[in-house]
Amino acid sequence: MNILLYMLFGFDKKQHKVLTELLAGLTTFIAMAYILVVNPSMLKVVGMDEGAAFTATLLAAVVGTLLCAIYAKLPYVQAPAMGPNAFFAFTICLSMGYSWQFALTGVLIEGILFVILSVTRVREWLAKLIPESIKIALGIGVGIFIAMLGLTNAHVIVADAGTIVGLGDIVHGEALLAIIGILITAILSVRRIPGALLIGIVLTTLIGIPLGVTKMPEHWVSLPPSLSPVFCQFDFSQVLTLDMLIVVLTMLSMDIFDTLGTILALTSKTGQLPPKTFNRALMCDALATTVGAM
């Protein structure tokens, strides 16, 4: 078993424990599971089938994460990012007026360019050119964005005409539960309780039941919705247009700096990656982007 784990994931029993890895994987899954709800709901706004978008989101996350685990041998989860998804839905489709098929074609082209840049190591070269201060800022920026996303979804902060961002109703519903969850997780983390994040998520979910926030599912097990309504639904009729060029270049730049920012933020805690591993991590992200477009 240890030999198999080492061959697949670079697992070393002297440095790692199976129970710790399982706990970390479960915690990461629960922390990332919101994407399975948020991403399809965003794509539904532009006309995509929500059930098919759910299945596509799930498959893209599975493919990206397995690539990272087996090929790059890194404990990183890959899934559709909220920034590019918001640009996909609200800018390309709603603001620019294009169909989601047009936007999906842009993602496919951007993903292919992403792979080419990774193969030629252009992204590795870009990473070396980034000053240390910008590397730190990228990690902080990603963290602030995720925090803003969570606080907004929980209605702790809301849009305000005067101050842009305002405080929501924090004594009721989702906002109250979010604050309780943050406090529980923070206390457990400060006390260095093993599995603090997982325990915090579970306790917050249970507390949400009497508050009426946590909804119990109608069915505990079911087959995933069909992928066919969105599978390979591309529109190549407007590939050679200025708007497509703008879309591709914008999404490419977002992906490059989002990926570099995330990896650099993670390595600030775990130590620098060897060049070979770093290149493989970039390639995994590029391949996952291309597969996700399909």
What are these regions (language model features)?
Residues 1-17:
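Short, Lys/Arg-rich, polar N-terminal cytosolic tail immediately upstream
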Residues 21-38, 107, 240-261:
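Core transmembrane alpha-helical segments of multi-pass membrane transporters/permeases
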Residues 62-70, 90-91, 115, 183-187, ...:
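Alpha-helical transmembrane segments of multipass membrane proteins
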Residues 18-23, 104, 138, 238-250, ...:
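Select transmembrane alpha-helical segments in multipass membrane proteins
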Residues 158-172, 210-253:
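Helix-loop-helix junctions that connect adjacent transmembrane segments
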Residues 23-170:
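Early transmembrane hairpin of solute transport permeases
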Residues 183-226, 252-256:
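Flexible hinge motifs at transmembrane-helix junctions and intramembrane kinks/re-entrant loops
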Residues 14, 43-59, 63, 249-294:
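Membrane-embedded helical hairpins/re-entrant loop segments and their flanking transmembrane helices
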